[in-house]
Amino acid sequence: MNPIVKQFKYGQHTVTLETGAIARQATAAVMASMDDTTVFVTVVAKKDVKEGQDFFPLTVNYQERTYAAGKIPGGFFKREGRPSEGETLIARLIDRPIRPLFPEGFFNEIQVVATVVSVNPQISPDLVAMIGASAALTLSGVPFNGPIGAARVGFIDNQFVLNPTMAEQKQSRLDLVVAGTDKAVLMVESEADILTEEQMLAAVVFGHQQQQVVVEAIKEFAKEAGKPRWDWVAPQPNTDLINKVKAIAEARLGDAYRITEKQLRYEQIDAIKADVIAQITAEDEEXSEGKIVDIFTALESQIVRGRIIAGEPRIDGRTVDTVRALDICTGVLPRTHGSAIFTRGETQALAVATLGTERDAQIIDELTGERQDHFLFHYNFPPYSVGETGMIGSPKRREIGHGRLAKRGVAAVMPSLAEFPYVVRVVSEITESNGSSSMASVCGASLALMDAGVPIKAAVAGIAMGLVKEEEKFVVLSDILGDEDHLGDMDFKVAGTREGVTALQMDIKIEGITPEIMQIALNQAKSARMHILGVMEQAIPAPRADISDYAPRIYTMKIDPKKIKDVIGKGGATIRSLTEETGTSIDIDDDGTVKIAAVDSNAAKNVMGRIEEIVAEVEAGVIYKGKVTRLADFGAFVAIVGNKEGLVHISQIAEERVEKVSDYLQVGQEVNVKVVEIDRQGRIRLTMKDLAPKQETEINQEDSVEEQE
């Protein structure tokens, strides 16, 4: 075995590509490394097409092995299970830029498998996997119009940083991944701390320029190690069949695409499609239904795109920059902590915000380390939202991806834990869908959070944009419909506040989209976002001053860290009894910060008072009320503040001589005692004699407790 190796510098890192030694039965296999983070990527492509195949069956699997980080998986079976949310998102990140680079009409099955086999905690495996997939596809000989490069762009101290480390990323105001060929950007996925449109576009251009190093390196690698390119020729169009479909359907489809209501339009289009299939198959029984449908779909695209380029009204009658009618309701669910319904045309999201305590945080165990997530965002897309029946179950890749995009849009305005000590979960239920449900989720989430009283820094809105380009002419569409989404050449989603962008996702299907075109599109998206924010601000101008009556209120207090063990008690007995008896939950940080969550404020104040008693210092000369806990021949033990026990010697029980302790005291009896002495070992000596005017200490919980709501 003589492996072929290509090594090159990429920014501050060294990238190594190796092939020829492992997985030689795969169509292509590449071991891609970047500073000890290594991803093994294989490509298997079938030479034959399944009979009746009418779509491109590309599958991308991304899997992380725990041995890559020197760990053994948890759980009973001690092996990796189903893909995590993070793995699913990275699989989508690999898929999106490579899919448009396969030629139209190529229907051979291809599977890309990326396996993380070694990980440097400072280098995220996602970029390495994208570079490895690009290299493997380029070597494989399949008709892939790559290679692509991939870059991560950070923004630190007002400077763009190429492929920042995990430590650097914590200081960055931007996390942007861009992928593309030597000529064009194909995919952008980003999260930003409210940057301007100009800064976002500059980051995209910067990343695309820098990744040319990768594109050139893979081309050189392929010259040395690549397999012969497949002798694949695109199938010739069946002009006779195309003309037949046009003759039957063109005029009728033109009329159907003037119906503004989605369901009525779809019914009409389905009827036309069924009629076309019936007429053509009646004339020619051997005519393929799949090919007829493909031609019919292409005709739909041609009609809609032609009208847009010609400047005619869109499918629903709007101009290119008009946003659909908006309708907003907040506080729609009486017992939830915050809720809103956001409707834009025929797209509708029911967003619900729930407040929880720190123990509700999600613990995420990644290869690069364990972390806690205090802001959860879940997106559900049930089949009824598009008038269909279907399976209801665990979230699919699309739902996970849309939920993450919506979360990115809102994350920048969320308060820190110090400002608002709650774990927050937002769920977006898509109840209607006709384009851009993920951006409706951003708007709905912003409204629900404000309804819940979460002090977000600003309202956030999202908008989905499209672009249609024919030669030198192009048209940017604001607030695209579902039909416009898949017929366009670029679709991108922008979320942000009035001040700037918080998330940008872009998928480009053709070459020739220049930075100038992107700038025009981003500016048009900004105008649409401002319009939506204006309507949202009318519905709820600021976060509610108070949280819901049904949400837990979190009260904080400070204790001496040395006293934490006293509050917890032996085996957790003290803290357990406090929570069980009062119905509260208590979290204690190492610095002595105590957080008490309770729906009932009286219960919280009760707990705080009891904690103050537990941690209170016993002072010599002060009289306390205590309870007799046990009797001995030589005296009685009495528990005073914080269940601290002291001894009342038999000689200190009464003024007269005491023969038998039980003649004077019983277990459980409440008595007043004075602290005589606390010795070096912390033992407390008490007396019941000479109790001058009572000086019982009173602990004022109100003075030392700060309520945070």
From Swiss-Prot:
Transmembrane segments: none annotated. The lineage of its organism: Bacteria, Pseudomonadati, Pseudomonadota, Gammaproteobacteria, Pasteurellales. This is Polyribonucleotide nucleotidyltransferase. SUPFAM superfamilies: Eukaryotic type KH-domain (KH-domain type I), Nucleic acid-binding proteins, Ribonuclease PH domain 2-like, Ribosomal protein S5 domain 2-like. Belongs to the polyribonucleotide nucleotidyltransferase family. One of its GO terms (molecular function) is polyribonucleotide nucleotidyltransferase activity. The keyword Transferase applies. Involved in mRNA degradation. Catalyzes the phosphorolysis of single-stranded polyribonucleotides processively in the 3'- to 5'-direction. InterPro entries: ExoRNase_PH_dom1, ExoRNase_PH_dom2, ExoRNase_PH_dom2_sf, KH_dom, KH_dom_type_1, KH_dom_type_1_sf, NA-bd_OB-fold, PNPase.
